[in-house]
Amino acid sequence: MTQTTKVSLRGLYKIFGNDDKSVLPHVKAGMGKEELLTTHKHVLGLRDINVEMQSGEITVVMGLSGSGKSTLIRHLNRLIEPTDGEILVDGVDVMNLSTTDLRQMRQNKMSMVFQKFALLPHRTVLQNAAMALDIKGLPTEEQEQEAKNWLARVGLGGFENHYPAQLSGGMQQRVGIARALTSNSDIMLMDEAFSALDPLIRTDMQDLLLELQVELKKTIIFITHDLDEALKLADHLVILKDGAVVQQGEPQGILMNPTDPYIEDFVSDINRARVLRVRSVMQPL
């Protein structure tokens, strides 16, 4: 099957500081994170990121704290502005969008699921799930019907009139996923979406996401620091260190052929046979 690139990151750099453009040549010449901070009092967020994210696939961006993974995902909808580089969505450079077009892209093309759930406590589960449609100005009846459908799909049928504080963490995150799906966006950005959950609930949420993805074929960009989660979810895995891509590719390939000592340390404790067997079972016939 022919793949279609949905999101492209090309030569993407992010330097945090008051004069990022002036220190960019130093970074491009090879200056590292520590030297940049010591010498110029700027912080290196991303260095020369080149990633192609395919339509209908889950791209997982993984790394330790401070690796740049959350910085990366916030560039896709321009919550963070890059220092240099291109961000293409469906072939359109996001950096060239007007304020109006950027707002339209955020409303219609991308949805986001956060680690801390980001639910409005004074709104019911139904109202939270329907939020994207409310912002779009759809009739209330249409909003509620669509939100009810997705709440039922994520296992929250009957909880429409509850408030977030009445739900467990796992249930609150199901509301977050229902809200993202209700928006009917092509692209879902999931920033450490399951990291705050207990292990068993986390596994359930991973299974739910994979189950929905079989049918919906969304383009999902998923951020995590957990290798087991990354290997379970990823069609394409991108591993970051100090703001740069260390290795990327199909998860099994990275697992069997790590190209860097940093990656070798990550995968050393993984049961390769179990992971390969699980991913083989998950492949459609």
Positions of PLM-derived features:
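Conserved ABC ATPase "signature" region
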Residues: 20, 25-35, 92-93, 130, ...
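Helix-to-loop junction immediately C-terminal to a conserved catalytic motif
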Residues: 77
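Conserved ABC transporter NBD signature motif
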Residues: 85-93
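Short coil-to-helix segment of the ABC ATPase nucleotide-binding domain corresponding to the Q-loop/switch region
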Residues: 123-130
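Conserved ABC ATPase signature
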Residues: 163-167, 171
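A short, proline-enriched helix->beta-strand linker immediately N-terminal to the Walker B motif
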Residues: 182-186
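Conserved ABC ATPase "signature" C-loop
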Residues: 243-244
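ABC ATPase "signature
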Residues: 248-249, 257
